[in-house]
């Protein structure tokens, strides 16, 4: 079976360890049926997504074979991480985004410096004094100030800006004619730390001329719905789900099964990962979290 996704995950983990040297690592997976709540709000949410290509050099798999291989690789990746001092979380009926948002603000990590590793723009709304986003594709760290500098929008108002613009990757159309530049230029108050709401944007449209502003005023319901789906400031998690996450964080045993990993790598045909620095780091991490 092709193993491009497993290798990619391991290489990103290795790179993060070298760059950040974190005290703890938490990997969050989408829970089974994770999109259910958002699909109840909008049944088209995430419809029509192209499957992620995990094996860049393999072109002879059918769509069904790609899907089977993806599930197999995800299971294998989880097995690898199970041998490491890495916390893995997967909450039924909850998307990974909501769990990550909860982790950023939960008492367990209060006062910690946190780095979210993702290419997803959804996480930019969570940048604050203690939280950075690292984007692997661009190989860059994004801080709160960088968000304001790059988009002209404060993280506090990022979900509102994205609700106006829409998100093609999640199949959520926004107001036609609006992009980050248009939003930042016409609604400059969104660069402030103060939280603004759709009504503030609609009020500002009254003084402006142009079809795009008419479309915005007429399309308020769509923007409100987009906001519900995109905002991560208050994650859609029950008290029980939060308690389950808290329990896992508190009771996790940091262990490292180096020999088992080497056996698995031989079985799966891994040849190019240098484990020496990761072994040193993981051994240190196990001691640190005893």
Residue ranges and their predicted role:
Residues 116:
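Conserved SAM-binding loop
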Residues 1-113, 123-141, 231, 236-251:
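Noncatalytic, basic helical substrate-engagement surface that gates or grips nucleic-acid strands
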Residues 154-157, 165-239, 261-262, 268-275, ...:
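Accessory alpha-helical DNA-binding modules that contact the DNA backbone or grooves
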Residues 141-151:
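Short, charged, surface-exposed secondary-structure boundary motifs
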Residues 160:
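Conserved active-site carboxylates
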Residues 245-247, 251-290:
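Conserved "right-hand" nucleotidyltransferase catalytic core of DNA-directed polymerases
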């Amino acid at each position: 079976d092709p193993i491009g996704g497993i290798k990619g995950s391991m290489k990103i983990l290795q790179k993060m360890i070298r760059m950040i040297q974190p005290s703890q690592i938490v990997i969050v997976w989408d829970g089974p049926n994770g999109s259910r709540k958002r699909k109840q709000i909008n049944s088209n949410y995430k419809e029509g997504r192209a499957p992620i290509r995990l094996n860049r050099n393999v072109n002879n798999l059918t769509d069904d074979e790609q899907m089977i291989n993806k599930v197999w690789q995800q299971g294998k990746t989880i097995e690898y991480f199970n041998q490491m001092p890495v916390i893995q979380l997967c909450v039924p009926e909850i998307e990974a985004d909501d769990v990550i948002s909860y982790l950023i603000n939960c008492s367990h990590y209060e006062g910690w410096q946190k780095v979210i590793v993702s290419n997803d723009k959804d996480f930019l709304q969570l940048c604050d004094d203690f939280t950075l986003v690292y984007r692997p594709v661009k190989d860059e760290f994004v801080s709160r100030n960088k968000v304001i500098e790059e988009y002209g929008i404060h993280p506090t108002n990022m979900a509102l800006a994205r609700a106006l613009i829409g998100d093609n990757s999640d199949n959520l159309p926004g107001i036609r004619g609006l992009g980050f530049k248009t939003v930042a230029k016409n609604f400059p108050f969104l660069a402030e730390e103060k939280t603004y709401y759709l009504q503030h944007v609609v009020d500002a449209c009254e003084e402006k001329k142009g079809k795009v502003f008419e479309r915005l005023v007429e399309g308020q319901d769509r923007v409100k719905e987009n906001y519900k789906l995109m905002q991560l400031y208050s994650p859609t998690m029950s008290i029980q789900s939060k308690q389950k996450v808290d329990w896992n964080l508190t009771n996790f045993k940091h262990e490292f099964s180096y020999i088992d990993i080497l056996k698995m790598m031989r079985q799966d045909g891994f040849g190019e990962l240098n484990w020496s620095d990761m072994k040193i780091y993981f051994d240190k991490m196990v001691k640190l979290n005893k």
